[in-house]
Amino acid sequence: MSSTFSGDETAPFFGFLGAAAALVFSCMGAAYGTAKSGVGVASMGVMRPELVMKSIVPVVMAGVLGIYGLIIAVIISTGINPKAKSYYLFDGYAHLSSGLACGLAGLSAGMAIGIVGDAGVRANAQQPKLFVGMILILIFAEALALYGLIVGIILSSRAGQSRAD
């Protein structure tokens, strides 16, 4: 590395790994949730086409999960500038844990939204009273990803606090 580099030379690897983990895992959850609940919407649309727009809620909720990963990835990547200020292993590990917290929470929420959305829209076609219950379960599943986003922001903000620069 050049002499203008400040901090630990391997630390940015962990920081960028955290940004990648946040985006990749969150988008995997979003893709799974969208695909799984989308199959349910398509299957239900054959029987009850008038309910397709009402049943698109799980697909939208799953798609939002990717945005959470994008937010954390941008926060992490803007915090990695070793030439401007020192970037140590503590910072890299903080960013890695931030990305993993948000990404894995998004992955698990996407799986939950996909499974609940698939079963929920199919059940809604048979019994419309189940719609409210499906929405409540989807909200609780989405909250899992929000918890990961909040913890990711907190962990990412810890980067740079290990020293008095």
UniProtKB/Swiss-Prot annotation:
A GO cellular component entry from the record: proton-transporting V-type ATPase, V0 domain
Cytoplasmic-side positions: 34-55, 118-129
Keyword tags: Hydrogen ion transport, Ion transport, Membrane, Transmembrane, Transmembrane helix, Transport, Vacuole
Protein name: V-type proton ATPase 16 kDa proteolipid subunit
TM region positions: 11-33, 56-76, 96-117, 130-155
Cell compartments where the protein resides: Vacuole membrane
InterPro entries attached to this UniProt entry: ATPase_proteolipid_c-like_dom, ATPase_proteolipid_csu, ATPase_proteolipid_su_C_euk, F/V-ATP_Csub_sf
Biological source species: Kalanchoe daigremontiana
